[in-house]
Amino acid sequence: MFIGFDYGTANCSVAIMQNGQPLLLKMENQSTLLPSMLCAPTREAVSEWLFRHHQVPATAAESQALLRRAVSFNREEDIDVTPSSVQFGLSSLGHYIDDPEEVYFVKSPKSFLGASGLKPQQVAMFEDLVCAMMLHIRNQAQTQVPEAIDQAVIGRPINFQGLGGDEANQQAQGILERAAHRAGFRDVIFQYEPVAAGLDFEATLTEEKRVLVVDIGGGTTDCSLLLMGPQWHNRRDRENSLLGHSGCRVGGNDLDIALAFKSLMPLLGMGGQTEKGIALPILPWWNAIAINDVPAQSDFYSSANGRFLNDMVRDAREADKVALLYKVWRQRLSYRVVRTAEESKIALSDRPEHAVSLPFISEDLATAISQEGLETALAQPLQRILEQVQLVLENGKEKPDVIYLTGGSARSPLIKKALAEQLPGIPIAGGDDFGSVTAGLARWAQVMFS
């Protein structure tokens, strides 16, 4: 049996085809979305959990070496890896919030798959993280259908996050493909996420149109200019319908990080001075919230940086504020800070101002973010998103009849306004912002596996 599988940066979901229509399956708490989060007692627990409780083989030499190291480490640390040791979605977030210093927590592993300079053991570790999530999701789906799920069309961005170009894309897709096979999928096909979103929109069209799909996901923005309509239904070869592609490594997570940096980090002393009037370096505050950047987070949570932050507290004119950044380091609170920014961004979709509090850092720590503050904070990443629209139009050399806007950030009035100003007079359509890619992947799976 086949599924469409959106392994997303922010959320994961799967769909089957039922009576000619995509049906998204339940993932967590009756929701069709599983937030892309995972936690375990230690990083090493994930590899042992896969092998011990789900009989997932460590196929490659590096995976086998990782498993041996993991089992040895867990034994030395007296860590008992049980079936419930690895948690996913909101459950994992709850464990992390309860005890951030003692829980290994990962948000959006997809963000790291295209990172440059990953060592073989790091690639193996990310493969295990992805495999664990895929296995959990497949098992959740399997409880809702009678046939064995062993085929999947998996969505992928035009360009994965990372600076390595084609090499980064090959690395990331390779991790996803190997993880999917280890998680029990016999046949795996990939489809571009904006094309998949367009396929779901195409089902509503009664005539051929040039459709500009703008898919703003958690980690990337992908644009495709496509010929779509009834005459293209069920055709495996759609090369002539693809007029242009473009994609960049900016998505909803980057909007959240930008908002956290501009609006929340000043509460933690960013922009301050030493007692001698020397400006404090900005980099520690950026690294603190750059949760989709492996080197930045490694640098921030290093022991050397802990000592540096301690010295900075001592020298700062507003030592009490900088001490709050030190607390973020000490208690590993980066994800909670960025999640607070994300919640503020969502709240500002339908109100002029939002009151923000960060009691997990300090009981009375609070501020207000206005629409103007949001616009200022998001100006740079939003400009990069609009550049992708311009690139795909230049690539396709045609003007769209309609814009199909989808993805988790599609609800933002700022983004709709910016697109309307960039392409005046062209209607902007929307659908299921969180499910259109998954639905389109299920439609494509039916074409490819039937």
Question: Language-model segments: which ranges?
Answer:
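Glycine-rich beta-strand-to-loop/alpha-helix junction loops that act as flexible
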Residues: R156-P157, V402-S409
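Phosphate-binding glycine-rich/basic clefts of nucleotide- and phosphate-handling proteins
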Residues: M37-A40, Q64-A65, M228-F360
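Phosphate/oxyanion-binding active-site loops and adjacent basic polyanion-contact surfaces
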Residues: F105, M125-M134, A168, Q191, ...
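Phosphate/pyrophosphate-binding loops at sites that engage ATP/ADP/AMP, CoA/4′-phosphopantetheine
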Residues: I137-A152, I385-V402
